[in-house]
């Protein structure tokens, strides 16, 4: 038996069969941040970015991305997502935007990939909406910070 669940005994890629797994409540939160100059962050906090409301647009993009994860990530199961929330917080200390995406479902497999996809697409949207003002922005620190439910149990890191 392979240690990698998406690789069979012959080394071929496969989609894991989750049909025999119990449906349980599952939740995952992923986080990252976009660093930028203070002047660029001011465009967000003052609502003067040329492309419009950066935080609202990034929030919607992240939600849409979570729902499309199985179309973007090979071998990722399509899931019935129960909820997606995105927190986008301007942080003058970075300076930049802190992003956290939480995804919930009840099903046989976890939602870590959906949370990671939501956070990363929200960050990409922030970059896209502000790139005319600053090309040196950086998307950093993408990681799962919390996961609950399923056979492997709970996980937490900050």
UniProtKB/Swiss-Prot annotation:
InterPro entries: MoaC (IPR023045), MoaC_bact/euk (IPR047594), MoaC_sf (IPR036522), MoCo_biosynth_MoaA/MoaC (IPR050105), Mopterin_CF_biosynth-C_dom (IPR002820). GO terms for molecular function: cyclic pyranopterin monophosphate synthase activity. It is an enzyme of class 4 (lyase). It holds the Pfam family MoaC. Its EC number is 4.6.1.17. The keyword Lyase applies. Pathway: Cofactor biosynthesis; molybdopterin biosynthesis. The active site is at residue 128. GO terms for biological process: Mo-molybdopterin cofactor biosynthetic process. Keywords: Lyase, Molybdenum cofactor biosynthesis. Substrate binds at residues 75-77, 113-114. It comes from the Bacteria. Belongs to the MoaC family. Catalyzes the conversion of (8S)-3',8-cyclo-7,8-dihydroguanosine 5'-triphosphate to cyclic pyranopterin monophosphate (cPMP). This is Cyclic pyranopterin monophosphate synthase. It comes from Acidiphilium cryptum (strain JF-5). The gene is moaC.
């Amino acid at each position: 038996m392979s240690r990698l669940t998406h690789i069979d005994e012959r080394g071929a890629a496969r989609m894991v069969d989750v049909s025999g797994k119990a449906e349980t409540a599952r939740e995952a939160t992923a986080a990252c941040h976009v660093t930028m100059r203070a002047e660029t962050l001011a465009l967000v906090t003052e609502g003067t970015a040329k492309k419009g409301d950066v935080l609202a647009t990034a929030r919607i993009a992240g939600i849409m991305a979570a729902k499309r994860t199985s179309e973007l990530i090979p071998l990722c199961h399509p899931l019935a997502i129960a909820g997606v929330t995105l927190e986008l917080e301007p942080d003058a200390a970075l300076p930049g935007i802190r992003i956290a995406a939480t995804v919930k479902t009840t099903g046989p497999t976890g939602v870590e990939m959906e949370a990671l996809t939501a956070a990363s697409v929200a960050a990409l949207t922030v970059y896209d909406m502000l790139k005319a003002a600053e090309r040196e922005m950086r998307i950093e620190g993408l990681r799962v910070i919390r996961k609950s439910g399923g056979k492997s149990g709970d996980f937490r890191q900050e």
